[in-house]
Amino acid sequence: MSRTPIIAGNWKLNMNPKETVEFVNAVKDQLPDPSKVESVICAPAVDLDALLKAAEGSNLHVGAENCYWENSGAFTGETSPAVLKEMGVQYVIIGHSERRDYFHETDEDINKKAKAIFANGLTPILCCGESLETREAGKENEWVVSQIKAGLEGLTSEQVSKLVIAYEPIWAIGTGKTASSDQAEEMCKTIRETVKDLYNEETAENVRIQYGGSVKPANVKELMAKPNIDGGLVGGASLVPDSYLALVNYQD
């Protein structure tokens, strides 16, 4: 099974619609063929309309950074997965450490979101990762495996085959510290083995696993050379057209 590499930018709370259009115009003609590398930008909800319109007809795929687990109702301030699908969004990030930390999202919340995202024909990018304290205590595998088990609860093997899992060690996000490519590979391998234990070998071979945490043009090739790393979830380096292009075109 050859898994298509996926490089996804996570803009977090950055960029406005005007900057979004300028970014897309700067990158859209230089993106790789999606059969070689899938290029994704996950943007704030307020930028998605501009991003989708600007990216139309290009090789850029669009993701949201969050959504709710209900499609409609009295949920002030939330984003509907059904409307994201109608708009043309393909991916939704869930379980990012910033959501878990600042907005107190639990594994149960994240699992409900995963189910709602799949029910609407979208693909979740499920984030997992440990803190520095957990790693220093030697409990990183236990921690990440429990996040994966809880996040995938009740999902079918067919759904999980289409899933993207992003391993983001919290201590490496926006700190300039990167897990070594060996550390990243080791955890991505553990994640794949967990999927195999929960489902079967075929599902584990199909699931795409990204590394996130200070991914930049200088380290992307080394990370992507690892057998269990299928992509990157990229923060700061995805805000600048030149560095984003260097990341998605890492094979050149």
Curated annotation (Swiss-Prot):
Gene3D superfamilies per the UniProt record, alphabetical: Aldolase class I
Pfam families: TIM
GO MF annotation terms: triose-phosphate isomerase activity
GO cellular component: cytosol
Key words, A-Z: Cytoplasm, Gluconeogenesis, Glycolysis, Isomerase
Record's function text: Involved in the gluconeogenesis. Catalyzes stereospecifically the conversion of dihydroxyacetone phosphate (DHAP) to D-glyceraldehyde-3-phosphate (G3P).
Name of the protein in its database record: Triosephosphate isomerase
